From Swiss-Prot:
<dbReference type="InterPro" id="IPR011775">
    <property type="entry name" value="Mg_chelatase_ATPase-isu"/>
</dbReference>
<dbReference type="GO" id="GO:0015979">
    <property type="term" value="P:photosynthesis"/>
</dbReference>
<dbReference type="GO" id="GO:0016851">
    <property type="term" value="F:magnesium chelatase activity"/>
</dbReference>
<protein>
    <recommendedName>
        <fullName>Magnesium-chelatase subunit ChlI</fullName>
        <ecNumber>6.6.1.1</ecNumber>
    </recommendedName>
</protein>
<dbReference type="GO" id="GO:0015995">
    <property type="term" value="P:chlorophyll biosynthetic process"/>
</dbReference>
<dbReference type="InterPro" id="IPR027417">
    <property type="entry name" value="P-loop_NTPase"/>
</dbReference>
<feature type="binding site">
    <location>
        <begin position="11"/>
        <end position="18"/>
    </location>
    <ligand>
        <name>ATP</name>
    </ligand>
</feature>
<keyword id="KW-0067">ATP-binding</keyword>
<dbReference type="Pfam" id="PF17863">
    <property type="entry name" value="AAA_lid_2"/>
</dbReference>
<keyword id="KW-0436">Ligase</keyword>
<keyword id="KW-0547">Nucleotide-binding</keyword>
<dbReference type="InterPro" id="IPR003593">
    <property type="entry name" value="AAA+_ATPase"/>
</dbReference>
<keyword id="KW-0149">Chlorophyll biosynthesis</keyword>
<dbReference type="GO" id="GO:0016887">
    <property type="term" value="F:ATP hydrolysis activity"/>
</dbReference>
<dbReference type="InterPro" id="IPR045006">
    <property type="entry name" value="CHLI-like"/>
</dbReference>
<comment type="similarity">
    <text>Belongs to the Mg-chelatase subunits D/I family.</text>
</comment>
<comment type="pathway">
    <text>Porphyrin-containing compound metabolism; chlorophyll biosynthesis.</text>
</comment>
Length: 338
């Protein structure tokens, strides 16, 4: 569900964050777009059309359609504002009287994924641009009295190492979900990862071919889940309890409630069911809320564990506590509900 609002992955160096995110591009399905349109306009949804396509659609003219893979666009840390937003060719505009617009990365990312590696090191002026586009879904470029706007609805995906700096709360709140990656401690699993990496380095095409059936099956499962999503139901009592958890944790705004509802439904659809259970909510609520809690420098427990503790009390389930769960927010909850 793109409306969840993307995901932020923070964790130790060398844990495969960037590799995992870039691998998502192969799982993404094809979508219908207007042919030769730089903004990947949707042929049927006016909110996802550029002004030019909308005008053409309004006159009843035939709009050519093609199918393209969902785009994954990398936003480099050193990118300029013009490269991100796009530029207007003033000289051409003055001499020929036409709006000559060179689309930027936001145009390319419309209806796709915008990925920012080391997002916590991103310049403040680029953060402001991202916040503006993520909030409105449109990108506006104004130069010398000429104004151009186009849709910029993208799923924001970021990764970074928390040791290298904190992220601004305004941008952090724009990520629907927040995952923490920790280095694998189990020796057998570490050996398996190293062996698979060596196998890939020796012969990449053979390695990819070996896992292609699993990849295809996963892609098919995601497409089927998208079709099933509108039929998924979340009981009113469960929605009330989700909001109770958010209220108890003093989460600012209502974005936490909305994202948790959407994420629980998306997980249910992914597993081929139409009724959300308590266990579905348990599996997503920490990801949806841990980054929305107010930071308390005197707090000794992890924010993820705090979410789990409040969830267990309000939903009436048993939380199995241990030392490691308090340390990294990976506590287990025994629900007895499926």
């Amino acid at each position: 569900d793109p409306k969840i609002g993307g995901v932020m992955i923070m964790g130790d160096r060398g844990t495969g964050k960037s590799t995992t995110i870039r691998a998502l591009a192969d799982l993404l399905p094809e979508i219908p777009v207007v042919a030769n349109d730089p903004f990947n306009s949707d042929p049927s949804d006016p909110d996802l059309m550029s002004d030019e396509v909308r005008q053409k659609s309004g006159t009843g003219a035939e709009i050519p359609i093609e199918f393209k893979k969902v785009q994954m666009v990398d936003l480099p840390l050193g990118a300029t504002e013009d490269r991100v937003c796009g530029t207007i060719d003033i000289e051409k505009a003055l001499s020929e009287g036409v709006k000559a617009f060179e689309p930027g990365l936001l145009a390319k990312a419309n209806r796709g994924i915008l990925y920012v590696d080391e997002v916590n090191l991103l310049d403040d002026h680029l953060v402001d641009v991202l916040l503006d586009s993520a909030a409105s879904g449109w990108n506006t470029v104004e130069r010398e009295g000429i104004s151009i706007r186009h849709p910029a609805r993208f799923v924001l995906v970021g990764s970074g190492n928390p040791e290298e700096g904190e992220l601004r709360p305004q941008l952090l709140d724009r990520f629907g979900m927040h995952a923490e990656i920790h280095t694998v401690k189990e020796p057998a699993l570490r050996v398996q990862i190293v062996e698979q990496r060596s196998e890939f380095d020796q012969n990449p095409p053979t390695f990819l071919e070996k896992y292609n059936p699993e990849q295809t099956a996963l892609q098919k499962k995601i497409v089927e889940a998208q079709k099933l999503l509108p039929e998924v139901k979340l009981d009113y009592d469960l929605r009330v309890k989700i909001s109770e958890v958010c209220s108890e944790l003093d989460v600012d705004g209502l974005r936490g409630d909305i994202v948790t509802n959407r994420a629980a439904k998306a997980l249910t659809a992914y597993e081929g069911r139409t009724e959300v259970t308590v266990d579905d909510i348990r599996r997503v609520i920490t990801l949806c809320l841990r980054h929305r809690l107010r930071k308390d420098p005197l707090e000794s427990i992890d924010s993820g564990y705090k979410v789990e503790k409040v969830f267990a009390r309000i939903f009436g389930v048993e939380l199995l506590e241990d030392d490691s769960s308090q340390k990294n927010g990976a506590g287990q909850i025994k629900t007895g509900v499926r």
